[in-house]
Amino acid sequence: SAGFKAGVKDYKLTYYTPDYETKDTDILAAFRVTPQPGVPPEEAGAAVAAESSTGTWTTVWTDGLTNLDRYKGRCYHIEPVAGEETQFIAYVAYPLDLFEEGSVTNMFTSIVGNVFGFKALRALRLEDLRIPVAYVKTFQGPPHGIQVERDKLNKYGRPLLGCTIKPKLGLSAKNYGRAVYECLRGGLDFTKDDENVNSQPFMRWRDRFLFCAEALYKAQAETGEIKGHYLNATAGTCEEMMKRAIFARELGVPIVMHDYLTGGFTANTTLAHYCRDNGLLLHIHRAMHAVIDRQKNHGIHFRVLAKALRMSGGDHIHSGTVVGKLEGEREITLGFVDLLRDDFIEKDRSRGIYFTQDWVSLPGVLPVASGGIHVWHMPALTEIFGDDSVLQFGGGTLGHPWGNAPGAVANRVALEACVQARNEGRXXAREGNEIIREASKWSPELAAACEVWKEIKFEFEAMDTL
């Protein structure tokens, strides 16, 4: 008979294909699916595959004008989640042709743009993505990466030290610059604009940029070390963001900063390209990430946002502390830290890594540990994050009873002591408190910091368990 077979049919008839052999060029996704009661997992998984690729709720006439088998997403495997009766992991393969080259924005619009409001699902979380080599190669990635950054800064064999300037809102530009100078002079490598410092009435961006540049050049001259301040270029429009980045380059400073989730991937990728072309390092803050990644059964896991940032571009990204005031579990955190830094990462479910990822020499990103950490955490931080990281102590520097510069001295002495102890073969984690106590005997600044924050115990339940 003429015409086509109209009507609504089960997604699983077309989009659930357990025999499918995944291709090297497919983008693979692992979704944690919580179907509504009565919806079988195969149908729920197929619905996700359909709605995030070629499907719609009914058969349409124009399906006949395309090759569905070439373009459809496929749910190729479903597994139950241990200990969760209502949850499943659905694996979906997407043909590469569904995505625009070099666009993280398009990748997310396709994969997570529509399906999360789907009625057949009670909840949905994107746990991991496997980015195929063919797609990775369409991205510039980080402007410089870990090795180039070390070479630019001439700093090797240890983590880098930073500090967020507080109070985050309300300082004048000149006082802000003074705080920057004191921290850098004391021994930090970097200071940082807070993520919500953009250009407000009490401190316009241009004034801040000037005073911070003056501060870092003065500190550089006094210490003989290269210094940086993350100048936050985040703005209300891309044009304004670029104006700020260009001014930073004209000042000759080494690094700018961007809030990549609130600013958006399009703006971030634009800025990353500018930074590579103009020799600026790019520090990335993840403001708003917990809105997306904190729920265990719905949203997007941070490891996906981290992979997306490596593609879009950034040289540093905040990644939790494992020990401070913000949530984050050790194995999970180390999983996405490796995804940020390493070139090839094996599948390892115990660390939340669902797929083997090959970055084919895309530069790496330095993880930034920031939030509620102080000198007593230093041994654990050096042990957990290793050399290729940035450790940021905001309150842990500025809260020092003698002021910012002594606070910076305390952190630098603690770091150097931990690195030396490790290089001598001592177990920084086990002997941590002892290492810090020894160093504080010859550093009054460190002794004062130790007194304020006292020794710590690592005993609390993390929320993000597998």
Swiss-Prot record:
Keywords: Calvin cycle, Carbon dioxide fixation, Chloroplast, Disulfide bond, Lyase, Magnesium, Metal-binding, Methylation, Monooxygenase, Oxidoreductase, Photorespiration, Photosynthesis, Plastid
Site feature: Transition state stabilizer: K325
Recorded catalytic activity of this chain's protein: 2 (2R)-3-phosphoglycerate + 2 H(+) = D-ribulose 1,5-bisphosphate + CO2 + H2O; D-ribulose 1,5-bisphosphate + O2 = 2-phosphoglycolate + (2R)-3-phosphoglycerate + 2 H(+)
TM region(s), chain numbering: none
Top-rank taxon, per record: Eukaryota
Post-translational modification: The disulfide bond which can form in the large chain dimeric partners within the hexadecamer appears to be associated with oxidative stress and protein turnover.
Binding site for Mg(2+): K192, D194, E195
Sequence positions that bind substrate: N114, T164, K168, R286, H318, S370
EC number: 4.1.1.39
Purpose: RuBisCO catalyzes two reactions: the carboxylation of D-ribulose 1,5-bisphosphate, the primary event in carbon dioxide fixation, as well as the oxidative fragmentation of the pentose substrate in the photorespiration process. Both reactions occur simultaneously and in competition at the same active site.
This protein's name: Ribulose bisphosphate carboxylase large chain
Annotated organism of origin: Adoxa moschatellina
Taxon lineage: Eukaryota, Viridiplantae, Streptophyta, Embryophyta, Tracheophyta
Gene: rbcL
